[in-house]
Design a protein with these regions (language model features):
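Hydrophobic/small residue at the entry helix of a nucleotide-binding pocket
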Residues: 29
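Glycine-rich phosphate-binding loop and adjacent beta-alpha segment
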Residues: 89-154, 195-210
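Short, small-residue-biased leader/transition segments that mark boundaries at the very start
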Residues: 1-6
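Generic hydrophobic/aromatic pocket-lining and core-packing "Φ" positions
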Residues: 11, 34, 55, 88-92, ...
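Adenosine-nucleotide cofactor-binding segment
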Residues: 23-26, 38-90
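C-terminal hydrophobic helical "lid"/dimerization subdomain
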Residues: 143-213
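Short helix-loop-beta connector
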Residues: 14-20
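Residues at the starts of beta-strands that form the adenosine-phosphate
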Residues: 20, 43-44, 100, 126
Length: 213
């Protein structure tokens, strides 16, 4: 789904030749957005994150990395992927006049506050929501979700995406892995869960809270 989301938002935003683009949030989604944009003839592409350790990911992609305070302004498009109030507020500062922010974050039931009383209206800025459930409007009449999925799978054959796989655990360890991820004890971009082969008990017992249908 991550690669499908990135395809959708590239179709939605429609970056043009020479555009200045920032991707805020160098996690799995932001990293994949930068990956798909890195070979496009942009004028500038920056991957922006608070964590200096994410520079390693940017370097592996051949993409410029910046701390939010050092990111270059006057962007044509900003892809916001940090799922944070501060990240979205910074997006408003980095996007240029009449520019567009593509909001790719999921906030669930969290409420955020934005400074829309400053120059948001005077600069005619736009924040566009992203939702992977539908094909981007620019391609909706000529592509189906099946077409998009096929494209996403084909793009994942690029070995560059192997760099996003930062660890693996057996299926029986899933409850603990989820707790560690939620609690911040496990740092991961994309953590692989290894399912046992049919008829094999190599992965150990099925977790108690596992349900089959």
């Amino acid at each position: 789904m991550g690669s499908e989301m990135c395809i959708r938002d590239r179709w939605e935003a429609g970056p043009r030749l020479g555009d200045r683009v920032a991707v805020i949030g160098a996690g799995l989604v932001g990293g994949m957005v930068a990956t798909l944009l890195r070979t496009f003839p942009l004028g500038r592409l920056q991957l922006v994150d608070l964590d200096p350790a994410r520079k390693g990911l940017a370097d592996s992609l051949g993409v410029d990395f910046a701390h939010p305070d050092d990111a270059l302004p006057d962007c044509d498009i900003v892809f916001h992927c940090s799922a944070s109030e501060g990240g979205l507020e910074r997006s408003l500062k980095l996007v240029g006049d009449e520019g567009e922010i593509i909001e790719m974050s999921w906030y669930a039931d969290r409420k955020i506050t934005l400074p829309l009383g400053e120059d948001f209206h005077a600069r005619r800025l736009s924040i566009r929501a992203s939702q992977v459930g539908a094909v981007a409007r620019a391609r909706r009449h000529r592509r189906t979700t099946a077409d998009r999925l096929e494209l996403a799978v084909s793009l994942l054959k690029d070995p560059v995406f192997d760099g996003f796989l930062t660890g693996a655990s057996k299926f029986a360890e899933l409850p603990g892995v989820v707790q560690d991820l939620a609690g911040g004890r496990l740092e991961a971009l994309c953590h692989v869960i290894e399912y046992p082969a049919a008829g094999s008990d190599a992965a150990g017992p099925v977790p108690e809270n596992h349900h089959t249908t």
